[in-house]
Amino acid sequence: KPRYIWIDAAANFPDFANSKENIARDLALAKDAGFTDIVVDVRPTTGDVLFKTNLVDQVKFMYAWIGSNYTKVERTATWDYLQAFVDEARKQGLRIHAAINTFVGGNQIDGGTGLLYRDQSKAEWATQMNMQVGITSVMNTSESTKFFNPAHPEVQTFLCDLLKDLAGYDLDGIFLDRGRFLNLQADFSEESRKQFEEYMGGIRIQNYPNDILAPGASSLPATYPKYLTKWLEFRAKVIYDFMQKARTAVKGVKPGIKFGVYVGGWYSTYYDVGVNWAASTYDTSRYYNWATSKYKNYGYAACMD
């Protein structure tokens, strides 16, 4: 029976960032404890990475709890973090998987870290939030993790290219975490509006965003605005379509790599992040009034191994 251990990047950075010896020690302990599979987080919420790619910067530091202190841990080592885990896992006879935080591009930590803080040309990639004050870039909100707009074509291409680089490693599997919208208030960019209006057959929404969701609303209202349920359906399609592309990107490099996701189990409210992780045979609309009859078509379970 497979037993997985998930190695979060930040929490384990003090031990592993600069020490192959500690990686070897803990993988031996994991094997001894009966684990069969190691999952290494190689793209934390800053959106920088711990594997070789030319597409984005390497993680230079993380914050982690050391005793009772939240401490900045710098990575001074230049060896390949993921490759060290792969080498040791193979030595120990363990299966090895990599996990990425997907639609993230920055974190408020240290005054702002990550692609969305460094590269102003990517400002349009940042998700646009439906706030009380109006539609606002996530960069100008208190949200600590700065999400991308999952519907933006350039974002999807960037992430698929990143996954191709990741699939070049000797991995058994790749997991996508945070493969979702930030929350119900995202994404209300002009890009998402344009795509939604096309999806609806070329209509023009006169009262935007109110005909979908009132500004500042962070949960479903008692009475649904005109286009709300179709909007939830559209968002599920955006994520479904991306997962198909991401799978194709990974399998195109290495057909044998397993492709999977990390999701929240609270299906009944997971519409708020635009994800239908059920099988397409499960008719969500039979059980929940927020789901249209087409919502089930975007259940992505079949994309996963």
Stretches found by the model and what they are:
Residues 1-20, 98-169, 216-228, 282-288:
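Active-site-adjacent "subsite" loops/lids of carbohydrate-active enzymes
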Residues 21-49, 169-173, 305:
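Catalytic domains of carbohydrate-active enzymes, especially glycoside hydrolases
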Residues 168-173, 177, 182-183, 187-261, ...:
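Active-site neighborhood of glycoside hydrolase catalytic domains
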Residues 35-77:
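Aromatic-lined carbohydrate-binding/catalytic grooves of carbohydrate-active enzymes
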